[in-house]
Amino acid sequence: GLIAMMDPPREESRLAVEECRRAGIRPIMITGDHKITAAAIAKRIGILKEESEACEGAVIEDMSDEELQDFVEGISVYARVSPEHKIRIVRAWQEKGNIVAMTGDGVNDAPALKQANIGVAMGVTGSEVAKDAAAMVLTDDNFATIVKAVENGRNLYQHIKNAIQFLLSGNFGAILVVLCASVAGLPVPFAPVHLLFINLLTDSLPAIALGVEPHSKAVMEQRPRPMSESILTKPYLLSIATEGVSIGVMTMAAFLIGYTSQNAALASTMAFGTLCMSLWAMGRIGAAEASPNGKQ
């Protein structure tokens, strides 16, 4: 007689792989199984495409590190690999300037998990050696959980940037107003109680709100950031400066309009009110951009 057995991939695996590709993440299969088996599973979940190939570990055995770096670009499935092969594949992608996350569950995966930028071990079926070598342990052994972690991380990073931009823009605008008034020999636009109110309420609460905005799926349509990229990029700083100058100009204009009546208290009140309303409007714009239905 004939007995056939099948261990099919999880239904959510294909969706997770597709989401990885949209996010600029390339999934690669490295397995000890036969090449035909590995290729069949990889095609089923979308890892192996027409533009990529499958190979066995023996193919890279005699390759130099430089040759391997060129070779890995066209390979999406590696079969019959040894622990040494896994390390070399991970290192080849790292030397090409990529962040590499490696998943594994066995003792033979431990060296590659340690070599990868992010080692991910299986929490249910994984060995203790693999868990010790990994930086992260999956409690449900589900690849989709890794994709969800990437989405959460990108959203958290975007929320932090939104909060920083809000705080720096508002404070930059207030500093410009005080500086311009001092240079022009005008009275100080803000009373101490105004500054206290701005720092405790007008700045803090909207910044906190921006930091806890609902997550957006739009972040998974973006390409990964370069490793060397600072959080304070030139476009980001330009945006902060533009918003700060706009706030400063509007606040200073309100102060000068009030000061034409020779009433310093009125001028200060108008400047304070304009600054608060500007910060409120900027917070609402930031919240709209960070919302699930807005742009990131």
Question: Which role does the model predict for each range below?
Answer:
Residues R21, K43, S182:
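Short polybasic/polar patches that bind polyanions
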Residues G1-G32, I36, M63-E66, I257-A271:
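Signature of the cytosolic headpiece of P-type E1-E2 ATPases
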Residues R14-A16, H34-I45, E84-I89, G106-A116:
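Acidic, divalent-metal-coordinating active-site segment for phosphoryl/phosphodiester hydrolysis
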Residues P9, A112-L113, A130:
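PDZ/PDZ-like domain micro-motif
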Residues K49-A101, A116, A121-G294:
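Membrane-embedded transport module
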